[in-house]
């Protein structure tokens, strides 16, 4: 997201630097969590594939290094190196998502849907983060253009809708591999946590992002930032 929006709009150097440093902080936390909590061999009775587990933290470490270099290029205004570094970070980040998807793809009916689900979920997180951060930047300087916020909000809304469609399709499909116990055979749609995932995780964010988009179009950056 940092690569896409920085290429499309004239974003301030301070904003780009803050965004890259924030992502680096999140990556460091993710690396620590993965190292301290290895992925189990099964989740809720369904087997996981942990053969490529060690490559996930390695890819995150590589991504952290590339983003650190990008932050240095932004700070020193080395414009010629910013785009290649951002592109490399996007490729390594996508690789990390694909590795994570491969770990949980065994019980999934379609590995493609699982990978798309993770990709769109990551795009939602990235779009919302960039928009929220730009909203805070706008509050410190009202002269900034509203177009980046409108595009970021619209992008997040579209990804949320596509993410929801994939979740609905995936929930209707059976597991491709049998679970280890009969408890895991319970109907998914009878579980409260499933509907919490749909309501709190999808329907509410779509409504909030739709309101944020309309607020951004009329210049209500404070409302947009709060909703996101």
What positions do the PLM features span?
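Polytopic transmembrane helical bundles with strong interfacial aromatic enrichment
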Residues: 1-140, 148-168, 195-228
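Membrane-interface interhelical connector segments
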Residues: 137, 141-145, 175-189
């Amino acid at each position: 997201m940092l690569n896409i929006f920085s290429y499309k709009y004239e974003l301030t150097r301070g904003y780009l630097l803050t965004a890259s440093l924030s992502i680096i902080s999140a990556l460091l936390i993710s690396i620590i969590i993965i190292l301290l909590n290895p992925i189990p061999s099964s989740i809720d009775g369904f087997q996981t594939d942990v053969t490529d587990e060690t490559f996930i933290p390695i890819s995150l470490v590589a991504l952290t290094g590339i983003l650190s270099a990008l932050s240095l290029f932004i700070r020193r205004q080395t414009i010629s190196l910013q785009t290649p570094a951002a592109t490399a970070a996007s490729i390594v980040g996508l690789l990390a998502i694909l590795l994570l998807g491969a770990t949980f793809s065994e019980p999934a009916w379609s590995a493609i849907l699982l990978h798309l689900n993770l990709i769109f979920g990551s795009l939602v997180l990235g779009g919302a983060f960039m928009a929220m951060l730009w909203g805070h930047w706008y509050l410190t300087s009202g002269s900034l253009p509203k177009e980046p916020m409108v595009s970021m909000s619209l992008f997040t809304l579209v990804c949320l809708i596509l993410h929801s469609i994939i979740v609905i399709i995936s929930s209707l499909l059976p597991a491709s591999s049998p679970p280890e116990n009969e408890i895991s055979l319970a109907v998914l749609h009878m579980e409260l946590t499933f509907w919490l995932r749909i309501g709190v995780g999808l329907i509410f964010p779509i409504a909030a992002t739709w309101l944020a988009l309309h607020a951004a179009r009329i210049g209500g950056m404070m409302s947009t930032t709060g909703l996101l």
